[in-house]
């Protein structure tokens, strides 16, 4: 089904939903996160901890509860660096400036550089892809080499 062209208002809506979702997630409020962001059936994730790409979004109660336990007491502000729109896609390049308790670690800066690809589907905008890296702060070539080696 053909949709109307993407307008500035669509990009603003997706940006707003992204900011609300980031704030909810870093607080561990996964169910609230899901009120802002729906995931496409072919969703892919390149998570900030590395590893193989994830395919699909596990919305089982067990997965949502595990995610909720992983994040605590944080706050986030999303800085949109650039946005692109074409056809039924909106791409956001953002920095999620956030802090919180992640895993068993105390509260700290967890800011991420993130690329998000949203696709317009029946029922609204769905997140099709997320690529996040924690490299908001510069690192040395040697540190990058160690990360690339997996050490």
Question: Where in the sequence are the language-model features?
Answer:
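Short beta-strand edge/turn micro-motifs at domain boundaries
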Residues: 110-141
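Short, cysteine-centered beta-strand-loop-beta hairpins and adjacent loop/turn segments enriched
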Residues: 70-71, 99-108
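Hydrophobic/aromatic beta-strand elements that line small-molecule binding cavities or substrate pockets
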Residues: 21, 78-83, 96-98, 113-119, ...
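A solvent-exposed, acidic/Ser-Thr-rich amphipathic alpha-helical stretch
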Residues: 30-87, 95
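Residue-level preference for beta-strand/loop junctions
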Residues: 88, 92-94, 109-110
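A short, polar/proline- and glycine-enriched secondary-structure boundary/capping micro-motif
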Residues: 102-105, 137-143
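Short, low-complexity N-terminal intrinsically disordered segments enriched in polar/charged residues
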Residues: 1-36, 146-151
């Amino acid at each position: 089904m053909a949709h109307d062209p993407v307008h500035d208002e669509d990009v603003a809506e997706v940006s707003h939903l992204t900011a609300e979702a980031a704030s909810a997630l870093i607080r561990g409020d996964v169910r609230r996160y899901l009120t802002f962001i729906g995931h496409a059936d072919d969703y892919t994730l390149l998570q900030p901890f590395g590893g193989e790409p994830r395919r699909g979004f596990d919305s089982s109660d067990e997965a949502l509860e595990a995610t909720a336990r992983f994040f605590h007491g944080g706050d986030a502000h999303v800085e949109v660096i650039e946005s692109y729109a074409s056809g039924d896609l909106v791409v956001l390049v953002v920095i999620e400036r956030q802090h919180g308790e992640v895993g068993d670690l105390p509260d700290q800066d967890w800011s991420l550089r993130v690329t998000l690809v949203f696709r317009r589907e029946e029922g609204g905008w769905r997140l099709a892809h997320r690529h996040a890296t924690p490299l908001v702060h510069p690192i040395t070539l040697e540190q990058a080499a160690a990360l690339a080696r997996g050490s």
